[in-house]
Curated annotation (Swiss-Prot):
Residues 56-75 bind DNA. Antitoxin component of a type II toxin-antitoxin (TA) system that counteracts the effect of the HigB-2 toxin. Binds to its own promoter and regulates transcription of the higB-2/higA-2 operon. It comes from the Bacteria. The gene is higA-2. Signal peptide: none annotated. Induction: Induced by amino acid starvation and the protein synthesis inhibitor chloramphenicol. This is Antitoxin HigA-2. Keywords: DNA-binding, Toxin-antitoxin system, Transcription, Transcription regulation. Coiled coil: none annotated. HigB-2/HigA-2 has been shown to stabilize plasmids very efficiently in E.coli.
Amino acid sequence: MSNRDLFAELSSALVEAKQHSEGKLTLKTHHVNDVGELNISPDEIVSIREQFNMSRGVFARLLHTSSRTLENWEQGRSVPNGQAVTLLKLVQRHPETLSHIAEL
C-alpha cells in the first residue's frame, strides 16, 4: 500500500477549485447527455420475465430482489427505482446479461 499525503491532495484540490471558480484555472470537464427518465411498464416487466420462462421467485432472486417486490412491480402496485429499471432494460436488450448476473 502506498503512503499518500491526503492533506496535501485535499489542499491542492481546494486551491484548484478556488482558482476554477475565480476563472483562473480551467478544469477538465465532461459533458454527459441527459438520458431522461427511464420508465418501464408492468407489462414490460412481465414480458421480460416470461422471455426467460422463469417463475417470479427465480427471476427475483437473479435480480437480487424479493419475489414480493417483483410481484408489486408486475402488478403496478409499486414502481422500480432507477437502478432496477436500468437493470431490467439492460436484460431486455441484452439477454445474455442475465447469465452474467447469475454468476455474481
